[in-house]
Amino acid sequence: MTYDVDGLRMRMPALKEGAAHFDGPGGTQIPDDVADAIDATLRSAVSNRGRGTAAEWRADDIVTGARQAMADLLGADPRGIVFGRSMTQITMDIARTLAQDWGPGDEIVVSRLDHDADVRPWVIHAERAGATVRWAEFDPATGEMTAHDVLRHVGPKTRLVALTGASNLIGTRPDLAAVAAGVHAHDALFYVDGVHLTAHAPVDVAAIGCDFYACSPYKFLGPHLGVLAASPDLLETLHPDKLLPATNVVPERFELGTLPYELLAGVTAAVDVLADLVPGDGDRRQRIVRSMAALEEYEDGLHTRMREGLESIPGITLYSNAKHRTPTETFTIDGYDSQAISEFLAERGVNAPASNFYALEVSRWLGLGDAGGVRVGLAPYSNADDVERLIAALRELTA
């Protein structure tokens, strides 16, 4: 399996501007294929979904196609694919819906490894319902979070556990399958924030064993919206707030208002790009698994090179040494303001923002407060030249 990063880079129009992008964890650049799919949809006759006019058929086919594409990407059932404005919005809606059945004596488990989108919705609605919130904590010295770190908070009163598939700040990847088994042993639900993970590794929600898996296509070469994968049977048991004339059919009952058809066309195009990162035969799911495995191997090698370069910078602190992680690093440098470092890099054409990136609990637990640090993350189009530019700029800064 040969990963052709140069071939992908040729399809990325934003890269022609010359920047080295380490801002992929906040949102990737998009290929021509995705932009073309969005443009073609907007330039065609548009309508709400139906089976009458050609425009109605087109809208319906776009939605059906996007559900199948996301199901292929995640190893999920297309009948359980829900689209929303963002992962944050979807998670808030699901939390509100589930909390209808929570009350005093119930317990909800969240983690200090998570983006706030997989923390605050659960905390808000647990507190409103009178349920107790329990916090799973990672080791700030290593960035590791073991299954035991989570499951020691799970018991007969637990209703739901929410956990990231990979930290968007430090890359740590918990053992989701082990957590899922422990959660289900207590008949609780398991909600996974897969926003950061989905961009870097093959995902199989059935193998993970989670009840809900949420992600965002704009983190893996697609447009801005959110996606939830769940069992259709589970979704049938949930009754979200919705408009009276809106359908009660699953998964549509969870999708408020008219879907953004042009963005859904872009989602399908993004999944097709991922499926074809490595040439080969097979159906789309098989090609996705093969391509994402090749991408993971490629990024692991490039990450090693980036990590070694970062470790050579005087005064630098890297905030994760977790064994299983994505190619994402957050760092600070003694004597330098993180925002000033980011601006210095930007002046040299290296995009590496500084923030807590909404991973507020992570940042605080690491001792970084609300300011966070400088984050550098690899994306499918990252290459060795990008890494060399980053390290050279940091050496210039600290010389």
Give the residues covered by each predicted segment:
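Pyridoxal 5′-phosphate
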Residues: 1-399
